[in-house]
């Protein structure tokens, strides 16, 4: 198609050029005939000669100025095409170096039950129960209560210090986010030699993976190395609202991260004075919302769009160069014709 368009454009331009040349030759023949009719001894008048020369001069100027303007326009188009190619390549490289972070949300009806790893130390677990929406009032705080949670105990070596053995209580977390399921735990610490009392905990994505893991010690060491740990203090009810964030790494792996919002409420201790020496811990775990946040880096540079744009720019450059070359040839040919006619007219007048 491109070759056909070029051939047709060249044919049209050559036909116009031949027509211009034929018109100029016809004009010259008519001038010669008028001179012959007037006779060899009679010269044309000065007024008619000056008028015809001025008309020819104006036509020659127009014929010379038009190709120059056309070449200037083609050069301007070539400069714009070169700048467009450079800018396209630069933008493509910048987009490859700096991908854009994309955040999307996926709604779920229920979550996989997360694992809650608690490190109570000397504290004793008094009760653990699943509730929905609300927590009933405490009947006997500080005393053992219902234990309807799935729990596992495991001892493993601290991955950051090989000389420390840690004892973890693994509790199955809530699942039914639409029903606002929550897990309420109560601990009691009788005596402590420390100035401040707190229990550490960490969250990992799936309690079922922990149960099915053939190496639970290695699983917990990997979780402690990958996830952050938090604390909740005694004498308060700490409400933890969890949210799940999945991040896609560059190598294609998917990393899971827990984000949480905590609210702390003071516990009004109404126990007898003899029992107040024991510190009580209350903690609630609940899902914040049914949306999983997915984060990944997206490269916005589209190679096909860039290739198409570059092809169009190079095609424009090629067409501009071809038209400029043809215009220069046409201008040179017209100039030669004009000089030839001028020489013939001068020799004829002389």
Swiss-Prot record:
Annotated Gene Ontology cellular component terms: cell surface; chloride channel complex; plasma membrane
Family the entry assigns: Belongs to the proton-activated chloride channel family.
Transmembrane recorded as keyword: yes
Topology in the lipid bilayer: Multi-pass membrane protein
Protein function: Chloride channel gated by pH that facilitates the entry of chloride ions into cells upon exposure to extracellular acidic pH. Involved in acidosis-induced cell death by mediating chloride influx and subsequent cell swelling.
First and last residue of the signal peptide: none
Glycosylated residues (UniProt): 155, 162
Lineage: Eukaryota, Metazoa, Chordata, Craniata, Vertebrata
Transmembrane segments: 65-85, 302-318
InterPro entries noted in UniProt: TMEM206 (IPR029366)
Organism the protein comes from: Pongo abelii
Swiss-Prot/TrEMBL keywords: Cell membrane, Chloride, Chloride channel, Glycoprotein, Ion channel, Ion transport, Membrane, Phosphoprotein, Transmembrane, Transmembrane helix, Transport
Extracellular face residues: 86-301
The protein, known as: Proton-activated chloride channel
Positions carrying Phosphoserine: 9, 14, 24
A GO biological process held by the record: chloride transport
Keyword Transmembrane helix in record: yes
Cytoplasmic side: 1-64, 319-350
Residue numbers carrying Phosphotyrosine: 10
Compartments it resides in: Cell membrane
GO molecular function: pH-gated chloride channel activity
Catalyzed reactions per annotation: chloride(in) = chloride(out)
Predominant cellular place of this UniProt entry's protein: membrane
């Amino acid at each position: 198609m491109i070759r056909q368009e070029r051939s047709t454009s060249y044919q049209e331009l050559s036909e116009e050029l031949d027509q211009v040349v034929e018109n100029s030759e016809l004009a010259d023949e008519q001038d010669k005939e008028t001179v012959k009719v007037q006779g060899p001894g009679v010269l044309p008048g000065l007024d008619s000669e000056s008028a015809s020369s001025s008309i020819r001069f104006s036509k020659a100027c127009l014929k010379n100025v038009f190709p120059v303007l056309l070449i200037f326009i083609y050069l301007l188009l070539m400069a714009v095409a070169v700048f467009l190619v450079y800018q396209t390549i630069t933008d493509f490289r910048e987009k490859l170096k700096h991908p854009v972070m994309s955040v999307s949300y996926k709604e779920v009806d229920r979550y996989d039950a997360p694992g809650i790893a608690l490190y109570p130390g000397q504290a004793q677990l008094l009760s653990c129960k699943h509730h929905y929406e609300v927590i009933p009032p405490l009947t006997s705080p500080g005393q053992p209560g219902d234990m309807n949670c799935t729990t596992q105990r495991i001892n493993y070596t601290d991955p950051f210090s090989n000389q420390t053995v840690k004892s973890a209580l693994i509790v199955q977390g809530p699942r039914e986010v639409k029903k606002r399921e929550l897990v309420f735990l109560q601990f009691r610490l009788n005596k402590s030699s420390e100035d401040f009392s707190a229990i550490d905990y960490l969250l990992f994505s799936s309690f079922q993976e922990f149960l099915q893991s053939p190496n639970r010690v290695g699983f917990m060491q990997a979780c402690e190395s990958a996830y952050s740990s938090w604390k909740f203090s005694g004498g308060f009810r700490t409400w933890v609202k969890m949210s799940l964030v999945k991040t896609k790494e560059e190598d294609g792996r998917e990393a899971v991260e827990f984000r949480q919002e905590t609210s702390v409420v003071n516990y009004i201790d109404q126990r007898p004075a003899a029992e107040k020496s024991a510190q009580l811990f209350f903690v609630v775990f609940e899902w914040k919302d049914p949306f999983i946040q997915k984060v990944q880096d997206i490269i916005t540079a589209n190679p096909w769009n860039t290739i198409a744009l570059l092809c169009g720019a190079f095609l424009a450059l090629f067409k501009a160069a071809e038209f400029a070359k043809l215009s220069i040839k046409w201008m040179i040919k017209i100039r030669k014709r004009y000089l030839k006619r001028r020489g013939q007219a001068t020799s004829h007048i002389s």
